[in-house]
From Swiss-Prot:
GO terms for molecular function: fluoride channel activity; metal ion binding. Its main location: membrane. This is Fluoride-specific ion channel FluC. The gene is fluC. GO terms for biological process: cellular detoxification of fluoride. PANTHER family: FLUORIDE EXPORT PROTEIN 1-RELATED. It comes from the Bacteria. HAMAP family: FluC. Na(+) is not transported, but it plays an essential structural role and its presence is essential for fluoride channel function.
Length: 126
């Protein structure tokens, strides 16, 4: 149990720092918070790969799933920042921008999760 906690904490630290780095790099001054979108899309693709690999390879130690999905990707991606940014847009009556942002995050994340799964399954079948 202690090893699982350590694995999650270590990976969560890396994911959170990467998310912060993307926000510092891409969010300032833009029409939409590009850093938040980037981490959610990258995370969507990566979780698709991870889910396909872990499902196809049940022999992989479960600690790896905790490290990759729960720790790293769980903190790299952010639903809370996305929600806060969209609600702020709505409160500013920037409705088109808010709904466009919702479409980009949800549609993009779902599409890239699917693409990540398909990519990994293709690679594993080779």
């Amino acid at each position: 149990m202690l090893l699982n906690i350590a694995v999650i904490c270590l990976a969560a630290c890396v994911g959170a720092l990467m998310r912060w780095g993307f926000a510092l790099w891409l969010n300032p001054g833009g029409l939409i918070p590009w850093g938040t979108l980037a981490v959610n899309l990258i995370g969507g693709y990566c979780i698709g790969i991870a889910l396909a690999v872990f499902t196809s390879r049940p022999d992989i130690d479960p600690a790896w799933r905790l490290l990759v999905i729960t720790g790293f990707l769980g903190t790299l991606t952010t639903f809370s920042s996305f929600s806060g940014e969209v609600v702020t847009m709505l409160m500013q009556q920037r409705f088109g921008l808010a709904f466009g942002t919702i479409a980009l995050h949800l549609g993009g994340s779902l599409a890239l999760t699917w693409a990540g799964m398909r990519s990994a399954l293709w690679w594993l079948a080779r």
